[in-house]
Amino acid sequence: MRNALKLNKKNYIDNIHSRSKGWITRSVIDKKGYSQWHYKYAELKDLDMSDENIYITLNTFYKPCRRLENIKELNTLFIDLDYYKTGKTKDQVLMDLEKNYFNQSIPIPNYVIDSGRGMYLIWIINAVPSKALPLWKAVQEYLYNQLKYFGADRQALDATRILRVPGSINSKSKTVVNILDEYEYIYDLREIQNGFLPELKPYERKKGRPSKINYIYRERSLYYGRIQDIIKLCELREYDLKGHRELILFLYRYYLCSFTEDIEKALNDVLELNSMFRQHLSEREVIRATRSAERCYLDKNKQYKYKNETLIELLEITEEEQKYMTIIISKKEYKRRENIRGKKNYQEQLKAKGKATKKEELNVLRKKIKALKEKGFKNKEITLMLEVPIKTLERHITYMKKNGLL
């Protein structure tokens, strides 16, 4: 039996992480409290996972730090069903799901796992980068809403979540975490979106007020972008944030609460970010300075809707720093990026039509000038042969001599 469980564990980890390039977190909860370590797949797959309360992350991180802004690959979608709160048995829940939900209102999960006191539903997807987090979160939210009836845990929807490993032991229920069912298939995130969340298709939007789900999707994209920008600002300033520490921590906590909907994890991440500051605040100071962020998040009638211009002014973000930002940028920086995109698109259109870009045309002309000069032709003769004005030719010759091209 133990060998079978080991095989189950190995196949499970292989199926989820064999293609992973990032760091995976392994956690243990024991008498000493919570501990966590970070591994690449090659190391993780050989670790013993048969002890009590062993967890791993199903998504991966750029560096060994389990925080939202470090997400590298989104490998799975998952829902934790606390069905024991509904009064239904495990078998009743499974029968209902198979008959009325799977491949109807939700995709068939790749894994149905008995976690000891609940049940995990896990969908394996072709890995997508962190930029897809707002869409990933929208799909998670959809799955949660479909499965609320079965006790779906709203606090288990964030991308950094740890889940129990098959073959490990749940110390509360004194049972082994076990795989109940498997489905061999790898989904695309867009495939699930298109099949089950048609409201998110841009081309299906109707005139007038946007649907609630599209509004939430845009809001989450904003929150996630600002989380990334706050961390980027800390990195650019090498964590020397004196004068802006309280505001940065406040914003970080507010946007984390709003995006992850996990107030406990948000506070822990804020405390961790503070510890990285060159001159960090005490834990009490951090909690006091950011408490209103959590209150505002919980009170849905109050929201901090800062404009980019306001954040740039409050945090004194320079034009150079804005070049590295995703969301918190000025109109001037936005226009600069638009110009770059416009030039790039124009050049791509020229290439698609088989036409040369301005730069390519100049290079061809200068090569012709060089060839004719080397053959001994005079400037007046070259102007006639290439059909260019004498002043234009002289300008090209000056440029070429200055840059060692002639």
UniProtKB/Swiss-Prot annotation:
GO BP annotations, alphabetical order: DNA replication
GO MF, any single term: DNA binding
Keyword tags: DNA replication, DNA-binding, Plasmid
Keyword DNA-binding: yes
Record function comment: Is involved in replication of pIP404.
Name the UniProt record assigns to this protein: Replication protein
Gene: rep
